[in-house]
């Protein structure tokens, strides 16, 4: 029990209550009581936060719009355990006001593990206009017809870094028409796995680094000899960043760079 330097039973009871709530063993004087009460408040808020996140993340299926909308920002999005969506992640963060998603997850000591999602991830971050960074996303198991990644980052006008986008190793991950639509600030993009589908359009992202563009080219699946037209749209600004030899890596695999 906490100690107080007075025989006043009332203060002793308050000190005991503070210790019970905070786990502190400090000696409390009347002058220190306000600080102790503040500690109780903070401890209560922490308990409230943990209870909320445990309840919010209790469902193991259907993460549709779980963190969508303007109420989710850098202050309200403070997860206490790993996020492992499955059963559908359509518009999971759509329209949120979170900025540095990758940084917040690291600060909270948790991860966003999408590897178990075997259904929809389209529009997952759509219209999240303040979003600047996205962590590594393992999308190898995601599948939604011809538009698995459609609108994934649509309208993310502040997004400059995607730490990793892991496509299916067999090249079957489909893009849709607006995966990177209006991603005008995007600089850093790393592609893992193989891109074996038409539809990738990065022409809006004119700030992409050379390394990012080479990551896209190196991830192209070898389609040489298939007799089918295959195309990746990079746009004239991005094409100007590549040498003829680098472009040839794509063409030798049967791809046209537009």
Residue ranges and their predicted role:
Residues 23-24, 110, 254-256:
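Short aromatic/hydrophobic-glycine micro-motifs
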Residues 13, 148, 212-215, 245:
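Extracytoplasmic/secreted proteins, especially bacterial periplasmic and envelope-associated proteins
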Residues 238-258:
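Extracellular/surface-exposed low-complexity segments
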Residues 1-79, 85-87:
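Surface-exposed receptor/substrate recognition regions of extracellular proteins
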């Amino acid at each position: 029990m906490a100690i107080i330097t007075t025989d006043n039973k009332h203060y002793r009871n308050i000190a005991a209550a503070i210790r019970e709530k905070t786990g502190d063993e400090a000696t409390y004087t009347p002058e220190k009581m306000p600080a102790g009460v503040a500690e109780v408040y903070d401890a209560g808020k922490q308990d409230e936060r943990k209870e909320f996140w445990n309840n919010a993340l209790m469902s193991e299926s259907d993460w549709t719009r779980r963190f969508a909308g303007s109420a989710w920002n850098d202050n309200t999005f403070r997860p206490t355990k790993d996020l492992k969506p499955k059963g559908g992640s359509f518009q999971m963060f759509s329209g949120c006001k979170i900025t540095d998603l990758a940084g917040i997850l690291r600060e909270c000591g948790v991860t966003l593990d999408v590897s178990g999602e075997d259904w929809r991830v389209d529009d997952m971050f759509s219209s999240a206009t303040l979003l600047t960074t996205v962590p590594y996303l393992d999308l190898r198991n995601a599948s939604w017809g011809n538009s698995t990644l459609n609108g994934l980052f649509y309208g993310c006008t502040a997004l400059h870094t995607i730490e990793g986008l892991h496509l299916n190793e067999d090249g079957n991950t489909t893009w849709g028409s607006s995966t990177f639509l209006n991603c005008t600030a995007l600089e850093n993009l790393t592609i893992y796995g193989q891109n074996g589908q038409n539809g990738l359009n990065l022409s809006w992202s004119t700030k992409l680094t050379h390394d990012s563009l080479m990551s896209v080219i190196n991830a192209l699946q070898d389609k040489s000899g298939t007799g089918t037209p295959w195309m990746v749209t990079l746009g004239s600004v991005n094409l100007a960043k590549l040498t003829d030899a680098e472009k040839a890596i794509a063409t030798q695999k049967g791809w046209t760079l537009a």
